[in-house]
Structures are given as structure tokens and as C-alpha cells.
Curated annotation (Swiss-Prot):
It comes from Homo sapiens (Human). Its main location: cytoplasm. This is Lambda-crystallin homolog. Homodimer. It catalyses: L-gulonate + NAD(+) = 3-dehydro-L-gulonate + NADH + H(+). The gene is CRYL1. NAD(+) binds at V16, I17, D36, E97, K102. The modification Phosphoserine is found at S3, S111. Its EC number is 1.1.1.45. It comes from the Eukaryota. Keywords: Acetylation, Cytoplasm, NAD, Oxidoreductase, Phosphoprotein. Inhibited by malonate. Has high L-gulonate 3-dehydrogenase activity. It also exhibits low dehydrogenase activity toward L-3-hydroxybutyrate (HBA) and L-threonate.
């Protein structure tokens, strides 16, 4: 068995996100305890993790320096939450996106942890001020929001509660770096955090352009996959601005008026009408039929592409 000297991490919830976190922490040499209220869920999760990690090994994409068997030896299931958190340095909550359910879990954890363990949520949209309200250990609470699928997309948004201690943010940031993720700090909470605010802005305008007959759904997706997305896989929108002129100030001097003119033509928030949804769905189903088999195959293809992109990015060092 591999050494677990790196520390012990508890995963609360054994769904897709929970399993991904378990694999990531094991890749960093951490002992991982997977907790779920259903023993069968834990067994299923451990079997899925074993299969997934074996496939990653075969593809040469297993993270970390430990072998697949060493990593698997670090992951175990535990149906008792009090036993699971004993000796833990970090607890990552991964239950369904339901505020009351998550609050119940955190209240339970709050009553049994010490003053050293970090309580972290994987929520994609729930505000820390609501999620951690009233907890005794609120200074130890933080949101660490991964991007799906977390094993292939390294970004993690760190969002503190207004009373979260700076050391909690620093420790979580260091932990994410240690397991190969790319943490970024959200300085203060905002609805949707940062990633989803940007994503929803794109979805909003994409929907409007399709709804108004300006572009077909399939051509809209090409704009991202064969255009913006290729740049954004390596540099963000602000660096793109910086490079597309003689620096940021030059870009703003040249293009800000034109940008403002176009932005003024943007309409209100789309209603996401049924008629447009059916139009988009018809176009999407021509590419990927919406039955479980085709969707699963396409997701697997997506993950394989992300795996290859991650490999490429690891080989391309910034100048």
C-alpha cells in the first residue's frame, strides 16, 4: 500500500463529482475516505473508480507519480460520517445541488469536526453566505467549485464566505495545486461565481443569435469550437485583447468604442422559449441523437479530447 503521509481527505457524496475528487486526491498521494449514506452507492463508486483509473493507465493519462494500484489502495469507503472525518485535514462535499440538503450536511459536519479541518463545497452556484450560515466553524469553510469533468479540466474556483479565514483560502489553494488542479481566487461571492457568469453570458448571446435567425445552431457552435475556443484553451479574453494590439491600453484606445457600439445592440435576457429549444434540439440531435447510448459515447469522446488537450498543454510551456 502507498504511504498516506500526505494526509487524509474525506469526500461526502459518491456521484460523478465525488468520484472525480477521490481520484484527484489519490493521485496526489492523499488517503481518501469516500462517504455516502448508502453502502451500495459506495461499492458502486469504488468499482467505477477502479475501472476509470485502469482506463486512464492504459491511455497513459493517469495523474500523479504513483501507480494505479498505489492510488487505488489510498481510496476506501466509509458509511459512517463520524468515523470518516476522524483525522481528516480536508472534507469535500459533493452531494446534489440542493441548498437545504447541503446545509444539513454541513451542520452535521460542523458538530463533529475540530478547528483544523477545512470544510469545502463543490457547489456550482450556491452562495457561501447562505451555504455556511450559522456554522460554528465558518472560518474553515470555503467553496471549491470544479469544472466538469474535473479530472480533465483543472480549474477550481475558490469562493470564501465573508468570514472565511485567509489561511483557509491559502491552504485550499495549496492543496489544489498539490493535486495538479489550477485554483483561482474569487475575491468575494457573486451569483454564479466567475466561470458560470462568463458561460451564461455566452449562452445568452448564442441563444439570441439563433432565435433571431442570424446563425444556425451548428454554425454557432463552430464559432466557439473552431474559433474563440481554440484561442481560449491557451490564453484568456484579457490576454487576447493585450496581444491583439500593442498591449491593453492600445487595444482599448483602438477598439473600445466599437465594442460599446456592438454591446448596445444586445437584447434582453432570452426567455429560452420552447420553440427555440426545439429548433436547437433538432439541430443537436442531427449531430448527436439524444438517446442514452449516443450521449454517453459523445461524452466519452469529449473526455478523450480533453485528455489529449491536457497532455498538449502540459508540454507547451509559456514563453
Amino acid at each position: 500500500m502507498a504511504s498516506s503521509a500526505a494526509g487524509c481527505v474525506v469526500i461526502v457524496g459518491s456521484g460523478v463529482i465525488g468520484r472525480s475528487w477521490a481520484m484527484l486526491f489519490a493521485s496526489g498521494g492523499f488517503q481518501v475516505k469516500l462517504y455516502d449514506i448508502e453502502q451500495q452507492q459506495i461499492r458502486n463508486a469504488l468499482e467505477n473508480i477502479r475501472k476509470e483509473m485502469k482506463l486512464l493507465e492504459q491511455a497513459g493519462s493517469l495523474k500523479g507519480s504513483l501507480s494505479v494500484e498505489e492510488q487505488l489502495s489510498l481510496i476506501s469507503g466509509c458509511p459512517n460520517i463520524q468515523e470518516a472525518v476522524e483525522g481528516a485535514m480536508h472534507i469535500q462535499e459533493c452531494v446534489p445541488e440542493d441548498l437545504e440538503l447541503k446545509k444539513k450536511i454541513f451542520a452535521q459536519l460542523d458538530s463533529i469536526i475540530d478547528d483544523r479541518v477545512i470544510l469545502s463545497s463543490s457547489t456550482s452556484c450556491l452562495m457561501p453566505s447562505k451555504l455556511f450560515a450559522g456554522l460554528v466553524h465558518v472560518k474553515q469553510c470555503i467553496v471549491a467549485h470544479p469544472v466538469n469533468p474535473p479530472y480533465y479540466i483543472p480549474l477550481v474556483e475558490l469562493v470564501p464566505h465573508p468570514e472565511t479565514a485567509p489561511t483557509t483560502v491559502d491552504r485550499t489553494h495549496a492543496l489544489m495545486k498539490k493535486i495538479g488542479q489550477c485554483p483561482m481566487r474569487v475575491q468575494k461571492e457573486v451569483a454564479g461565481f466567475v466561470l458560470n457568469r462568463l458561460q451564461y453570458a455566452i449562452i445568452s448571446e448564442a441563444w439570441r443569435l439563433v432565435e433571431e435567425g442570424i446563425v444556425s445552431p451548428s454554425d454557432l457552435d463552430l464559432v466557439m469550437s473552431e474559433g474563440l475556443g481554440m484561442r481560449y484553451a491557451f490564453i484568456g479574453p484579457l490576454e487576447t485583447m493585450h496581444l491583439n494590439a500593442e498591449g491593453m491600453l492600445s487595444y482599448c484606445d483602438r477598439y473600445s468604442e466599437g465594442i460599446k457600439h456592438v454591446l448596445q445592440t444586445f437584447g434582453p435576457i432570452p426567455e429560452f422559449s420552447r420553440a427555440t429549444a426545439e429548433k436547437v434540439n433538432q439541430d443537436m440531435c442531427m449531430k448527436v441523437p439524444d438517446d442514452p447510448e449516443h450521449l454517453a459515447a459523445r461524452r466519452q469522446w469529449r473526455d478523450e479530447c480533453l485528455m489529449r488537450l491536457a497532455k498538449l498543454k502540459s508540454q507547451v510551456q509559456p514563453q
